[in-house]
Each structure stands twice: as C-alpha cells, then as structure tokens.
A protein has these predicted regions:
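ATP-binding glycine-rich loop module of kinase domains
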Residues: 12-61, 65-67
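A short, low-complexity linker immediately N-terminal to eukaryotic Hanks-type protein kinase catalytic domains
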Residues: 1-17
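C-lobe/activation-segment region of protein kinase-like
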Residues: 131-226
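Conserved hydrophobic "DFG−1" position in protein kinase catalytic cores
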Residues: 31-32, 82, 129-131
Length: 226
C-alpha cells in the first residue's frame, strides 16, 4: 500500500528529478487523502478492457470501464460512475451541474499551468477523479512525473481530450437526434464540434460544456441529466 498523489502533492520532489512508481500493485489499497480506495483491475487482453471495482468514498466519481482507444491515442476511460449507489448519468456523477464541472476544469487547468515543466505521464480518465463534495478534479496514480519541455501543452491537451471523449461518449444519442433533423443540423454547433472531434480535432472542453448546455438544454427542449 502507498499514498496516491492528489492535487500535485509532493510536486517539488519531482522537480528534483525524482521518479515515483505506482504506489502499489493493482488490487491493493490506495490512500486518497484520509480515505482508503480499493482499486481492482480485471484485465481482458483480447478486447483490451479494464474494469475497476470497490471504492470507499461517497463523493468520488471513479471510472468503471477503460478502453484503450486508438482514435484518441491515449488510455481513455469513458465511463465514470458515481459509486454512492446512484449509478451512471452521462459520464459524470449524479448531481454534478454543468457549471460546477466547468469551474472544476478551469481550476485544475490553472494548477497545471503552475507546473509547466512537469509532464504527467499516463494521464487518462482512469486517473482523473471528479469530487462532487469539493467540486474539483483530482489527478492520481500517475506512473511517473518528470521534467519535460513543453509539458504544459501536452498535459492540457490530454486532460482536455479525455473529458471531451467522455462527454461525447455519453451524449451520442442526443447528438444523433439533433443531427437527424436537417434544419437543426445546419444550425447545430454541437454537431459541428462532434464532426471535428471525429476528425481528431478535439474542442476546448469548456466550450463544449457551454455548447452542450445551450444546444441540448435549449434547442431540443431536453435537460441534461447531470
């Protein structure tokens, strides 16, 4: 067992070229602040799917499925499950508001900006938690942190792309519904962002949240369920 890095704890030691391996083998207990997380991998090599189970914290969202998706060229967890018994809703925990998620994104981006020379190896949604109680994203369990030129842009890009992928994944039915009506499709900014995304041009996550809020909640008379 070992302590998981949370919110850039002990970052200064990494700026001194120290390297940290994973804080324990998969299936052992990890510490997240004062709570204990039991993180269990079930790896199926054939379809490259990884499952996570059992987390002891009522406020933490944690991925339940992980895909290794060639399109985004990084490990991507596309299902984030709120494990307090409320189930999955649109990739984010039940009760998380769009404005809160957007602010959490802005806040963590600012933190990443402070450490532009630190590269976060193995950043993926499997290692990005959304904490509803504090309205914040946390980065945990990175394989290595090390000084790197132009790390800031790479870190921001991966963080941004992971979250965009998760949001698109869980709203494809709404996007398809909007896109099936020609008049809406021609005016639909969300559909345009999705087309760009399919071409591997990821939108800014903040812009995407704003667009989802407007296009889905207003145009289609639907309310996003988070």
């Amino acid at each position: 067992m070992g302590k998981v890095l949370v919110d850039f704890q002990e970052i200064e030691s990494y700026k001194k070229n120290n390297i940290c391996g994973r804080p324990g083998k998969e299936g052992t207990c990890y510490y997240l602040t004062d709570d204990i997380i039991v993180k269990i991998f079930h790896i199926f090599v054939g379809n490259k799917r990884v499952y996570f189970d059992d987390i002891k914290n009522d406020f933490i969202a944690f991925p339940i499925d992980v895909y290794f998706d060639s399109m985004v060229k990084l490990e991507t967890a596309y299902t984030m499950k709120y494990l307090a018994g409320t189930g999955l809703i649109n990739g984010f925990p039940s009760g998380a508001r769009i404005e809160n998620v957007k602010q959490a994104y802005i806040n963590l981006r600012k933190v990443i900006e402070e450490y532009q020379d630190i590269n976060m190896y193995d950043m993926c949604l499997a290692n990005i938690l959304y904490d509803k109680s504090t309205n914040s994203f946390r980065l945990i369990d990175t394989s290595r942190w090390y000084p790197s030129n132009n790390a800031f842009s790479k870190n921001i890009e991966q963080f941004n792309n992971c979250l965009c992928y998760s949001l698109f994944r869980h709203n494809l039915d709404w996007i398809s519904e909007l896109s099936s009506v020609k008049e809406l499709r021609e005016l639909d900014k969300l559909h345009k962002l999705y087309e760009n995304y399919l071409d591997n041009n990821f939108p800014n996550f903040q812009e995407l949240l704003d667009t989802v809020s407007y296009e889905i909640c207003k145009k289609s008379d639907k309310k996003i369920k988070n």
